[in-house]
């Protein structure tokens, strides 16, 4: 949860052409982790394998699949209508398509998330959602529907953290803000979130046609944040 385990599995966002089951993907990750040299323990090294292994721990502790836990503990309590584990996306819906804005034209270089990459990342890249549902999840992590405020504080202040990252977030401004940025290998998807920790103000950006660098994207979000509540948010 703090990416200080020393686990350093390479190629988690590259397709290996395997149609993994959830259990199969977790076992594959364990084998890769055991066969790969580790980084220094207790130093920060973000790696998707940490979250895949966490999905495996959830399976072991609950006796149910990670997907079943997501449905019973998150999707149902929050009444989410647009959040699915990849394999469970209804046939009546499609997962999003990403594009680039290039040479003055929209919708260039169309790209879906690669099926095999998604399936090898349970707990780290196989949950598909919308910005509005994702915001409801953020609220649920504080209002008692998923976690209480006290439990969220524990999650975001784990003793093993070595920087401001803990439990999926970077906490800034003395813990008043939570931030997360992400993209997905070989696609153009980019997500950025910056919220106050009480979830009352902020922004959730889900982009399927980004333009510019990571910092340029964040600057666009920050220009919006300044209008939401001036003097509250940070640039990056």
Language model regions located:
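Short, surface-exposed loop or secondary-structure junction motifs
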Residues: 1-179, 185
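Aromatic/pi-system hotspot detector in well-structured domains
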Residues: 51, 100-101, 195-197, 204
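A short acidic/small-residue loop/turn micro-motif
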Residues: 118, 210-211
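Short, surface-exposed beta-strand/loop micro-motifs that present aromatic residues
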Residues: 181, 189-197, 202
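Residue-level structural signal for beta-strand termini and adjacent loop
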Residues: 183, 207-208
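A short local loop/turn or secondary-structure capping micro-motif enriched for an aromatic residue
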Residues: 188-190, 211-214
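Short, gly/Ser/Thr-rich active-site loops of penicillin-recognizing serine hydrolases
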Residues: 212-236
